[in-house]
């Protein structure tokens, strides 16, 4: 809706986000402004949402243009980006898109004993006081109500990245160096449900590259680089902030099920459930480990769609089961960002952000990876790192 309104008025979507919680039906002032018939309305919202600043991914050649001394580095945590606002006795917790999720995290809102607005990551603490996997946070998301047991089992907290409003002062135009100093003082008085994202000492980018590739924290996705002199600018300006995520993990899996996609892909079978081999009672069997789609070229999409239709062995409503045996099947190279244990999945494992990286038409299905490979990866790269 916000994007559609921005297109109607030919304005930046961040301007709509600024007003979103401060306008009410029938929205006469808003539409009059978008139609060019009136000035921009003033938001009457208390504890309003401020549009977030986003980072650009590091691309080839970017680092060669940067001076490490100009940038602060911090961990990129695997939670959800939030904005916590407490002003004039009103407290609100927003997602990065401005959705109010205060009702889902009343324990966090109750602990927001401050005046101002902070940008941060919503996470869950594990039993040792560290960061729990994203799957724990998922137990709290998208709920209309949350029980006392859920709050106790999955205690949420905020890891603060930035300070947007200090008391009654909007500090977004001040440089990051000053906002960070204020944030440190701010968080020191904010209570146990809010801590600060630690900075990583920057000597050179080679040192940061090693940390990015193998973060010492189990649930850090990589690094963020932010210019010390950067203002907090809504949107995704090029240059001030970069995200430098670790390289994805890769596994060869076999297509097991297919569904039609959405939008322009709605006529094609482009969403796939894939599995790896494990030893069952009757020998080797496939066990699902994830579901993903890939932005194929038109030629690839047509070829995949034909493969699914030609080798369907069963149907379950909109889902087609595809022939997948050791001597026949389609291997997909899957890229993913993380791995965690999950009792909800038959394999006992769940991937974070899986996507089809490559189609292995050349590889026999029997040579796809086994569940033991993922178990080893989990033990060595995630379980082990969590105990460092």
What are these regions (language model features)?
Residues 120-136, 301-336:
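Surface-exposed, charged, gly/pro-rich loop-and-adjacent secondary-structure segments at domain edges
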Residues 118, 156, 329-330, 354:
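Short glycine-/polar-rich loops that comprise or flank the Walker A/P-loop
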